[in-house]
């Protein structure tokens, strides 16, 4: 059986690092190694990680301060590339410092790669049932996060992704020119070389603990990054059209309310068509929050993707001010 290395990056994740490391060490069968790159933490994360590595030979801790915005436009990508370069196994599984993982996650995610039947696998993400906010539930589908571990997914996220080291080398690694959305760009390139294996039972358990403000800020940052990278034009056009329809309906209210009714029905479909079967279990407050967030999304995407396209200024990362983001 081919060995597998798990890699992750972190910066100022003292509140989460123990949970993620313990869940990765509990994988059955165990990984050959777990390589974690610290980008220069100042909150005690590095001290915890290095002490844990001194007790656990499978845990490889690397401190590389070039994997931060002080030195790199894309610190998360750089951290992953550093970790993968250091990893000794021919198969790489990506994990995330803001997630935890079931004991069979690694086995399920890499099964077809280990068997030689795939080069690239995607497991997806679902909300951690042990801790979430109403805005986590409301914003989930807009960040490719599922509400249930049994919900099918075909989304790409480096929270649960595996590939051969050879594929990573052919692609040229994770793109270091963007702060966020780097896994999407990696996925675009990977699909030029191979077809992904979608694994339904290998989801990362994610606990973002969002407020409306933090969820909106994250959506804004992803849109700016898409604009800077020049990707997802169809999403920009779709969301711009929704903005135009909303404005037209409001302007027409003094004469007729039919356009407003049409927009209401359209936005209801956008808000709930993906996962209402799971969403309604979270209660009426979550349903209302989902509708509210969905109405705001086209404005966040359209305005900020255009802004990103015409801005050369790199995004800022609040990890550099001492707050973790689970990335």
Regions picked out by a protein language model, each given a short descriptive name:
Residues 92:
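Short aromatic/hydrophobic "clamp" motif used to bind/position activated sugar donors
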Residues 100, 104-134, 207:
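Conserved donor NDP-sugar-binding/catalytic core segment of glycosyltransferases
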Residues 66-87:
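Glycine-rich, basic loop-to-helix element that forms the pyrophosphate-binding segment
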Residues 38-47, 66, 99:
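A conserved acidic beta->alpha catalytic loop
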Residues 22-31:
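Short, acidic, metal-binding catalytic loop of nucleotide-sugar glycosyltransferases
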Residues 128, 145-166, 179, 204, ...:
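A recurrent flexible, glycine/aromatic-enriched loop bordering the glycosyltransferase active site
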Residues 175-234:
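Catalytic donor/gating beta->alpha subdomain of glycosyltransferases that bind UDP-sugars
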Residues 1-23:
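N-proximal low-complexity "stem/linker" segments adjacent to membrane-targeting elements
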